[in-house]
């Protein structure tokens, strides 16, 4: 089925809602207030379907006080019905809506001159020619113009047939599904149902989606597209999703939905902006179905000779937003339209102003190779490609292909990280520092990567492989050149036992002890196994090892408590031993092995 999403646009009372009703019989003004006032206040959604063609309509309000509602409805549309009354011609909101369509990237326009039954030929001609002249000021593609009256069925039928035959190429980023909730319903017997416009790739019945604003992953229990159950929903379709999650109550109107793990939220967006704005201006950012308070920082103004007034700006937001590269937005100031633009860098970058402007120019021109080079040189300890769909509008596989063209770069394909070659040298210096301060250090690529969160295991192994003149290797471990490996193991055992004993009844966790000796976790685990096999260390829990003599001390103290109080439980033992609940429970359970002790409910007592 071919599916197209159309938004209406135009001045208040120019006949947008009446035109859609004439096309498909749907009454968009459904509330009492809308009917009483004769204007559209909220968004309404309907469709026209025939012979495999589906035209979805978003009827938006034309009143100047409802700009945010108009923007939230129009943002996902592929084309627009620009509705202009033949008797009034272009009015204030007509012009404003035209600008918004331009800012939102809605290039396909069907011009609808309405109320032709009550206008003269001169009025109709003037309204049409003036509208076309205004549209020519922008980069619009006017598909066709219609002279209409809702009382002239032939004119409505001509528009209807044109729309049903219309085909528009999908230009949306298809990397991932993106979905902003514009309405929520609780339906008896079904639960929570969200509606919104699906952009990008498809979603499937039974699949999983993630609400990034609420932090809730949910299942798709059922889906409908224009009141019909579907197993797959595609780009530019109006989709109702029946949400399956015990945390569904956290989901709110305006939330952003996609696949989990592909987006990060930030309070800053770097953008190209078209319009008029001053540095430090307080604005409302309209993006998707959201409206967020923001402050604009102007990075640079327009270049000489540019047709439109444009700026690179940074928007500092009141709350996090999960925006995407090239996502369209509109800015309002005091309720008035300031302009609009595109997000170029949705990920907050700690760049100086000059470097940031360079990056934005590269992103504006989609020169991703140059952008990757700048980011590689800026982030000496690597930058990731996992969120490349959000960051650059391309899949990680495509980002990897670009990264492989970089010079003086190391690419970790498994971890999707890009490093400058200097990162490897930094790792070598780090390893040299470890073995210089601790001659007993035993390392692996894994242990080095654990100590430096920015370094991947692959990068660590590359650095180690180039240090063969400085390191020896045995049993999967690297250590200082010339050191006796068997003595290193003995020294490690002695050191671990010493640290466990030093902790008395509250010993450190094994991994914390391993860090003291700069040893690989496997080497530390092997040393602990040897100590427990010898009986000098006892394992009480997954992460709790105590020396045998200190365990005897713990049991002795608990027996003293029982002698004093007649019993030992978590409450009195915790206070008596001055330990955390974790340690106290472990020692009480160890005491259960003493044949003199019996457990009655949660209390340990001496057998009678």
Task: Indicate where each model-derived feature is located.
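Conserved Switch II/interswitch segment of TRAFAC-class P-loop GTPases
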Residues: 61-64, 75-96, 106-125
């Amino acid at each position: 089925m071919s599916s197209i999403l159309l938004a209406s646009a135009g001045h208040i009372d120019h006949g947008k809602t009446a035109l859609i009703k004439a096309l498909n019989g749907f009454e968009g003004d459904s509330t009492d207030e809308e009917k009483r006032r004769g204007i559209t206040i909220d968004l309404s959604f309907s469709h026209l379907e025939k012979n495999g063609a589906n035209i979805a309509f978003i009827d938006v309000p034309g009143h100047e006080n409802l700009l945010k509602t108009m923007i939230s409805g129009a943002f996902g549309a592929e084309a627009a019905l620009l509705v202009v009354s033949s008797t009034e011609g272009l009015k204030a909101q007509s012009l404003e809506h035209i600008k918004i369509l331009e800012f939102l990237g809605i290039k396909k326009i069907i011009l609808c001159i309405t109320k032709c039954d009550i206008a003269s030929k001169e009025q109709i001609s003037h309204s049409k020619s003036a509208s076309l002249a205004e549209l020519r000021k922008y980069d619009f593609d006017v598909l066709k113009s219609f002279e209409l009256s809702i009382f002239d069925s032939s004119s409505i039928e001509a528009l209807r047939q044109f729309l049903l035959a219309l085909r528009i190429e999908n230009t949306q980023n298809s990397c991932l599904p993106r979905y902003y909730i514009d309405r929520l319903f609780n339906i008896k017997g079904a639960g929570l149902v969200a509606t919104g416009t699906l952009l990008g790739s498809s979603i499937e019945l039974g699949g999983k989606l993630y609400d990034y604003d609420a932090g809730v992953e949910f299942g798709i229990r059922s889906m409908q597209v224009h009141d019909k159950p579907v197993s797959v929903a595609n780009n530019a379709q109006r989709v109702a999703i029946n949400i399956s999650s015990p945390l569904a109550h956290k989901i709110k109107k305006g939330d952003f939905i996609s696949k989990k793990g592909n987006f990060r939220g930030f309070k800053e967006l770097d953008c190209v902006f078209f319009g008029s704005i001053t540095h430090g201006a307080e604005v409302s950012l309209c993006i998707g179905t959201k409206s967020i308070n923001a402050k604009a920082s102007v990075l640079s103004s327009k270049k000489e000779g540019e047709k439109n007034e444009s700026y690179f700006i940074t928007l500092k937001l009141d709350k996090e937003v999960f925006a995407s590269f090239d996502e369209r937005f509109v800015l309002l100031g005091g309720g008035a339209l300031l302009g609009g633009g595109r997000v170029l860098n949705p990920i907050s970058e700690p760049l100086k102003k000059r470097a940031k402007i360079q990056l934005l120019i590269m992103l504006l021109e989609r020169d991703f190779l140059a952008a990757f080079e700048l980011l590689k040189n800026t982030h000496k300890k690597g930058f990731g490609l996992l969120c490349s769909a959000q960051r650059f509008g391309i899949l990680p596989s495509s980002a990897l292909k670009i990264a492989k063209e970089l010079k003086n770069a190391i690419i970790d394909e498994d971890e999707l990280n890009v490093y400058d070659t200097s990162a490897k040298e930094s790792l070598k210096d780090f390893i040299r520092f470890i073995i210089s301060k601790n001659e007993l250090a035993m390392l692996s690529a894994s242990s080095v990567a654990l100590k430096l969160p920015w370094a991947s295991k692959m990068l660590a192994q590359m650095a180690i492989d180039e240090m063969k003149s400085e390191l020896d290797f045995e049993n999967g471990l690297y250590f200082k050149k010339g050191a006796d490996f068997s003595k290193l193991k003995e020294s490690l055992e002695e050191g671990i036992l010493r640290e466990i004993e030093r902790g008395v009844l509250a010993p450190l966790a094994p991994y914390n002890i391993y860090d003291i000796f700069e040893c690989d976790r496997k080497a530390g685990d092997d040393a602990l196994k040897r100590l427990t096999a010898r009986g000098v260390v006892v394992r009480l829990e997954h992460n709790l090892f105590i020396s045998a003599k200190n365990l005897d001390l713990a049991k002795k103290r608990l027996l003293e408590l029982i002698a004093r109080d007649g019993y030992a439980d978590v409450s009195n033992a915790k206070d008596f031993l001055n330990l955390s609940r974790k340690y106290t429970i472990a020692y009480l359970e160890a005491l259960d092995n003493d044949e003199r002790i019996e457990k009655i409910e949660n209390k340990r007592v001496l057998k009678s």
